[in-house]
């Protein structure tokens, strides 16, 4: 996310993002992008009227996760993309928690999709990596900046990621089955008020 936002935004630009998101992403946007003159606006997750109202001539990107972290709110990607297209603002979805097994935001027309490969894609909690998807021409500035910032992955990290991808489909099938069973059990439990699943 750092490479994408730093390569696509300049002083005076603004981004609007739904407030349910990974705290480090929110921290980077609110504390660090502001030092470079980029304005960050947060709106309640799923409130597309509030998101539209926050958009102005300086808005360059709409940002969300789907599902969100930590509440697992599924964002309506069709509305998200439609709002971006109607206002000519680029869209970014962090789909880490869904993984490409469950959700492919590019197929909805999202401009950029992020995944933390450290989590489900790697699967063994032993690598740090990320994935950014989008049009090749739109990613060219990111490729340039990542070399400057030093965020190029080692061959060993890529080996670990490839190892994780070999079992990715099986792990996600089991993860989905187990998650469904646990959610159904908890929904029936008398001491549980609400289940986020």
Predicted regions span which residues?
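Conserved PLP-enzyme active-site core in the AAT-like
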Residues: 1-189, 196
């Amino acid at each position: 996310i750092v490479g994408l936002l730093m390569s696509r935004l300049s002083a005076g630009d603004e981004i609007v993002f739904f407030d349910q998101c990974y705290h480090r992403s929110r921290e980077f946007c609110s504390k660090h992008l502001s030092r470079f003159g980029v304005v960050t606006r947060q709106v309640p997750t799923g409130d597309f009227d509030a998101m539209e109202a926050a958009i102005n001539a300086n808005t360059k990107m709409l940002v969300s996760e789907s599902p969100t972290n930590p509440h697992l709110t599924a964002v309506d990607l069709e509305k998200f993309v439609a709002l971006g297209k109607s206002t000519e603002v680029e869209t970014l979805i962090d789909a880490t928690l869904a993984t490409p097994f469950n959700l492919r935001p590019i197929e909805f027309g999202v401009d950029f999709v992020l995944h933390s490969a450290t989590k489900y894609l790697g699967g063994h909690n032993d690598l740090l990596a990320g994935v950014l998807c989008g049009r090749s021409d739109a990613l060219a500035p990111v490729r340039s900046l990542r070399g400057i910032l030093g965020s190029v992955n080692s061959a060993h990290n890529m080996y670990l990621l490839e190892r994780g991808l070999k079992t990715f489909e099986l792990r996600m099938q089991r993860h989905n089955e187990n998650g469904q069973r646990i959610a159904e059990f908890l929904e029936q439990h008398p001491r549980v008020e609400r289940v986020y699943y």
